[in-house]
């Protein structure tokens, strides 16, 4: 794909037999996502892979999406995330405490379980331990099947989800529905975004979403939070194992940090917001920024023009599919020196800017990830919990490859833990 698109700011490609304009110029991508976003709706090329409803934050309608984004924002902004840190740390500690020296672990499954536990506690608040464990197991299974779901090709073209994906979705949704029903009967016991969904109503007092739609919205939030975190953390731990010098520097930074490693938070294509008001991000955070540059979980995106637009030198009629890849944007040799190498120190002098989309691991604009601040803190905590306690190596004989499915994830990454 890189060879095909190199030197073409906009080029026509075919996806499943449908023509689309593929944009590689970061300034033009920024125009699509931010400046001219009102002229673009969500694309349909990859909708085949979706099994969730289009209510709430998945709404195709921009006004509806903005409404639910406003509902979610108070519970995911930086100040609110701080309140979730103790639970994040507890779940991270419990996850790594279950590992045994020398016994190979599926690192993506382990990170998925940790992320699912964090997501559940954030959305639902306190749950009975048995219920929480069951939800966590079902969510981890569903998230794994979602990760493996193709975005295009024959497997994605089918209108029916795979048997395993359908089974995982049905089982998790049924259990989740019972929890939502309990919260509907006692909405004051709900937490976070779920409480906002339960009490949201139109001007006539009628609930905006049905119980089923609330359940689907919860499924979407939980799976999105789980699959992306699991993928990013898997790559982070793999890269640490592959580069002892980077690992040593991360450990040194963590040793100097009493709590989470936040020294700055990369904004979705809009610059780096310093977490402490001054100075560059610390090495551990620069490492996470580099992981997200190399392996953004949402690696490809599609939009569709709602009206005729001019994009660079191209005039696009209404109904045109417009695609871009954060993976390719993040590896642009014109922006990044030696773009395929993991070099956290590049972020000492290089900062994401608001002028283009050369670094957008969480997207940008009105449909950028609403949980970005939450995700950064979660990644920091998980990285610290693992790296401080364990040294991981890739199991001998393993061949790790990137799988570009719903997320960009390592294909079956087995790692062997040894205590520090």
Give names to the regions the model predicted:
Residues 41-46, 80-231, 267, 271:
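Cytochrome P450 heme-thiolate monooxygenase catalytic core
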Residues 1-7, 178, 263, 271-312, ...:
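Conserved cytochrome P450 K-helix E-x-x-R motif and the immediately C-terminal K′/meander segment
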Residues 324-351:
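Conserved cytochrome P450 K-helix/beta-meander segment immediately N-terminal to the heme-binding cysteine loop
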Residues 226-253, 372-390:
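Cytochrome P450 catalytic-core helices
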Residues 92, 115, 140, 256-257, ...:
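Cytochrome P450 proximal C-terminal region
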Residues 1-67, 82-94, 338, 358:
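N-terminal membrane-proximal hinge/A-helix region immediately C-terminal to the signal-anchor transmembrane segment
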């Amino acid at each position: 794909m890189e060879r095909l698109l190199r030197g073409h700011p906009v080029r026509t490609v075919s996806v499943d037999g449908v023509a689309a304009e593929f944009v590689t110029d970061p300034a033009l991508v920024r125009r699509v996502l931010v400046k001219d976003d009102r002229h673009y709706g969500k694309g349909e090329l990859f909708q085949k892979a979706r099994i969730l409803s289009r209510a709430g934050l998945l709404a195709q309608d921009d006004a509806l999406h903005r409404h639910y984004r406003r509902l979610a924002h108070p519970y995911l902004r930086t100040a609110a995330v701080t309140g979730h840190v103790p639970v994040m740390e507890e779940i991270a500690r419990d996850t790594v405490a279950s590992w045994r020296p020398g016994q190979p672990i599926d690192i993506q499954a382990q990170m998925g379980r940790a992320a699912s536990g964090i997501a559940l506690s954030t959305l639902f608040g306190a749950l009975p331990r048995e219920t929480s464990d069951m939800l966590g197991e079902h969510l981890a299974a569903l998230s794994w099947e979602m990760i493996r779901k193709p975005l295009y090709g024959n497997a994605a073209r089918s209108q029916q989800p795979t048997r395993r994906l359908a089974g995982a979705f049905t089982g998790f949704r049924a259990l989740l529905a019972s929890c939502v029903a309990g919260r509907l009967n006692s909405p004051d016991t709900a937490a976070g975004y779920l409480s906002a969904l339960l009490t949201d109503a139109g001007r006539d007092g009628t609930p905006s979403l049905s119980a089923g739609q609330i359940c689907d919205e919860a499924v979407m939030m939980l799976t999105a939070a789980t699959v992306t975190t699991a993928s990013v953390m898997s790559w982070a731990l793999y890269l640490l194992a592959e580069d002892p010098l980077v690992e040593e520097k991360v450990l040194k930074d963590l040793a100097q940090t009493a709590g989470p490693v936040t020294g700055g938070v990369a904004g979705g294509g809009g610059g780096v917001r310093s977490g402490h008001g001054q100075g560059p991000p610390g090495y551990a955070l620069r490492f996470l920024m580099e992981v997200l540059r190399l392996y953004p979980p949402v690696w490809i995106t599609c939009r569709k023009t709602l009206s005729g637009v001019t994009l660079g030198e191209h005039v696009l009629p209404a109904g045109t599919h417009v695609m871009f890849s954060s993976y390719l944007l993040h590896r642009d040799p014109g922006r990044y020196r030696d773009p395929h190498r993991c070099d956290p120190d590049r972020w000492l002098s290089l900062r994401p800017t608001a002028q283009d989309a050369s670094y957008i691991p969480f997207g940008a604009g009105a449909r950028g990830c609403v949980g970005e601040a939450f995700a950064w803190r979660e990644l920091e905590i998980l990285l610290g919990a693992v790296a401080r306690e364990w040294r991981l190596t890739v199991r001998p004989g393993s061949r790790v490859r990137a799988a570009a499915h719903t997320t960009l994830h390592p294909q079956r990454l087995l790692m062997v833990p040894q205590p520090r």
